[in-house]
């Protein structure tokens, strides 16, 4: 199946329909050198001219592979050849034996967010695409079948006053590759993307083995889940506005009578959000921990 490249007009419509920006925006773009981020850079390079803004390609060298430093130099030349400013962040660390992807991801976001604050960048784009979204959906589905997190990767996420924007979530990876090919842009290939020790790689290979019809079915399920979760989010927001009080030192108060009338699903998600915020954590507690707490509270 041949996938068409993404046109300038198509991309412009996507941005204007889903996102808003300040006048003459300064936007950071996470660039790994893969087809996804190179396609995003190409599309943004044209779009930003209309707003008279500027973009900065931000590359994070995880320093996990011997060839990563050489790849960074090759990438810098490619980006500068496109007329885009480039900056590199190198992660210096000791050997990591476990939870490599999780630790690397957390460190990457931490350092990139810090750089954006320093440069007064309030919008950061990443090149997550439809394939990534489906992979994440399947991975989360295996872990937690009813969580709001199952709706997968959000278009916009705000972290420390920085908007993390993902404008490519509606596009297949094949279309991003076609976009690079049309502009004769070669992308880098990370060999870790083929290492089946990582769950995401195994899920990716699983999806590759499925028919187009099956992929469409999974995507349809994902979209339905988004609609269901949006309705849940509205109910949670309504509860927070009416029944939640926050105090100093992470203390919160909710109306027990109103809380007890909610469904178990809403109770779990409400407590997840409260505890994540009160604890200053990036990730919410596990569902089984919340259930244990609810059962304990019920017995008292």
Sequence positions of predicted segments:
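Glycine-rich active-site loop/lid subdomains used to bind and stabilize high-energy intermediates
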Residues: 182, 214-218, 229
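Residues that cap or delimit alpha-helices
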Residues: 172, 211, 263-264
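Hydrophobic/aromatic-lined pockets within catalytic cores
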Residues: 142, 211, 275-279
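AMP-forming adenylation/ATP pyrophosphatase catalytic core
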Residues: 2-36, 54-56, 91-96, 107, ...
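Core alpha/beta nucleotide-donor-binding catalytic domains of modification enzymes
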Residues: 2-206
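Conserved anion/nucleotide-ligand pocket segment
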Residues: 204-218
């Amino acid at each position: 199946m041949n996938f068409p490249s993404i046109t300038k007009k198509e991309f412009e419509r996507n941005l204007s329909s889903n996102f808003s920006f300040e006048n003459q925006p300064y936007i950071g773009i996470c660039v790994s050198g893969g087809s996804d981020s190179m396609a995003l850079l190409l599309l943004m390079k044209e779009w930003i001219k209309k707003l008279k803004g500027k973009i900065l390609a931000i590359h994070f060298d995880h320093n996990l592979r011997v060839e990563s430093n050489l790849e960074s130099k090759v990438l810098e030349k490619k980006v500068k050849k496109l007329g885009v400013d480039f900056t590199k962040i190198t992660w210096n660390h000791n050997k990591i034996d476990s939870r490599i992807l999780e630790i690397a991801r957390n460190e990457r976001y931490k350092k990139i967010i810090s750089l954006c604050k320093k440069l007064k960048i309030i919008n950061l784009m990443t090149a997550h695409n439809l394939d990534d979204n489906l992979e994440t959906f399947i991975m989360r589905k295996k872990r937690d079948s009813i969580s709001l997190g199952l709706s997968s990767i959000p278009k916009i996420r705000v972290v420390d006053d920085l908007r993390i924007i993902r404008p490519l979530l509606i596009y297949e990876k094949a279309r991003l590759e076609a976009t690079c090919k049309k502009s004769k842009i070669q992308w880098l290939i990370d060999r870790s993307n083929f290492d089946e020790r990582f769950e995401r790689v195994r899920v990716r290979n699983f999806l590759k083995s499925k028919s187009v019809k099956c992929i469409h079915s999974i995507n349809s399920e994902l979209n339905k889940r988004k609609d269901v979760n949006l309705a849940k989010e509205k109910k949670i927001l309504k509860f927070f506005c009416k029944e939640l009080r926050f105090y100093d030192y992470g203390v919160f108060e909710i109306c027990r009578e109103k809380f007890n009338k909610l469904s178990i699903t809403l109770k779990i998600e409400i407590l997840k959000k409260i505890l994540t915020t009160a604890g200053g954590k990036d990730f919410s507690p596990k569902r089984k921990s919340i259930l244990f707490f609810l059962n304990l509270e019920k017995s008292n």
